[in-house]
Amino acid sequence: MNKIMLCLLVCGVVHAATYDLLKAPNYFEDFLHKFNKNYSSESEKLHRFKIFQHNLEEIINKNQNDSTAQYEINKFSDLSKEEAISKYTGLSLPHQTQNFCEVVILDRPPDRGPLEFDWRQFNKVTSVKNQGVCGACWAFATLGSLESQFAIKYNRLINLSEQQFIDCDRVNAGCDGGLLHTAFESAMEMGGVQMESDYPYETANGQCRINPNRFVVGVRSCRRYIVMFEEKLKDLLRAVGPIPVAIDASDIVNYRRGIMRQCANHGLNHAVLLVGYAVENNIPYWILKNTWGTDWGEDGYFRVQQNINACGIRNELVSSAEIY
C-alpha cells in the first residue's frame, strides 16, 4: 500500500471515529431509526438514552486513547456492558464435565513459522453467523472449528447445527451458557453433528430432535492445550486449524475496525474462533471470528494485538478436536 492510500485510509478512520458528546441526543435519534428501536414507555426511552450517553462517552475515550482501533455507535449502544454480556455471549461453567479431552502442555518455544497466516485465504472458514439473544457462543465457536476441520479434510464448506447442541447437549446449558471443551466432549457423546439445514437455529432452548441418520460429522477425539507462550498459538493454529478461544468481551462490544491494543482481561465470558494472524505497521495481531453478525466489527471479525494477552485470550486452555 503506497503512502497516499495509507494516509487516505487512516484519515478516513479518524474522521469516522469522531463523535461529539454534546450531540448525544441527535446520535440517539439516528440510532433509534437505524436499528428500528422501540421502547415500552418514555421512562424506558430515557433510561436507554442515559445508557447510550454513557456508552458514547466510553467510545469517544477509546477512540482518543487507542490509535490503532476504531469504536462506534452500533446495535448494542443502548445496552449496558452487563446487559450486552449477559444477552450476547454465553461462556459459563457447567455443573459437570466429562473429561474426555486429553490435556497437552505446549511448553516448547514457538517455531519459526510464517509471519502471516489466515485460514480464510484457503477457503476453510464458514461465513459469519449471528447468535442473537442466546448465550450459545460456546456452541458457535466449537462448531465453527468443526466446520473448518471438515473443510480442511474434505475441501467443502458446510454449516453445522448449533441448535442441536443447544437442545441436546446434556452437560452445557444451551442459551444459558457452556464451555468449549465440554461441547467437544458432548459431540463425542451424541455420536455426531447434523447440518444447520436439517436442524435450524431458533435462538432459544428447545426439545432435542436429534436424528443420527442425518449426522455429517463425528468427533473422534479432543485435546485441551496449556499454552505457555502466546506465540505458540500460531503453531497450533497452523497445525490443527481454526481454534475456539475464550475471551473477555467487555471491550469489544462497540468495536468497529482496526487492531485493539487495549482489551480488558477481568473475566472470561465469550467464545470466538481464532482463524489467523498477521502484522500491520509493525504490530502483530490475531484475527478472530465473532458471532454477532456481519454488521458488527470488520464484517463480523475483529483483531487484537498479540503477546499482551488481549481480552484474556491466553487465560483458558484452548481446545481442538479430530473429526471423522
From Swiss-Prot:
- Could you say which enzyme class this protein belongs to? hydrolase
Question: In this UniProt entry, which cysteines form S-S bonds?
Answer: 134-175, 168-208, 263-311
Post-translation changes: Synthesized as an inactive proenzyme and activated by proteolytic removal of the inhibitory propeptide.
What the entry lists under InterPro entries is as follows:
Papain-like_cys_pep_sf (IPR038765), Pept_asp_AS (IPR025661), Pept_cys_AS (IPR000169), Pept_his_AS (IPR025660), Peptidase_C1A (IPR013128), Peptidase_C1A_C (IPR000668), Peptidase_C1A_papain-like (IPR039417), Prot_inhib_I29 (IPR013201)
**What SMART domains is this protein classified in?**
Inhibitor_I29, Pept_C1
This entry's Enzyme Commission designation comes to 3.4.22.50
Q: Which GO terms describe its molecular function?
A: cysteine-type peptidase activity
Where in the sequence is the signal peptide annotated? 1-16
What residues does the annotated propeptide cover? 17-113
Glycoprotein recorded as keyword:
yes
| CDD domains per UniProt | Peptidase_C1A (cd02248)
What is this enzyme's catalytic activity, as reactions? Endopeptidase of broad specificity, hydrolyzing substrates of both cathepsin L and cathepsin B
What is annotated as the active site?
Answer: 137, 270, 290
Keywords, in A-Z order: Disulfide bond, Glycoprotein, Hydrolase, Protease, Signal, Thiol protease, Zymogen
Residues modified by glycosylation: 159
Q: What is the role of this chain? A: Cysteine protease that plays an essential role in host liquefaction to facilitate horizontal transmission of the virus. May participate in the degradation of foreign protein expressed by the baculovirus system.
Report the family membership.
Belongs to the peptidase C1 family.
> What name does the UniProt record give this protein?
Viral cathepsin
Originating gene: VCATH
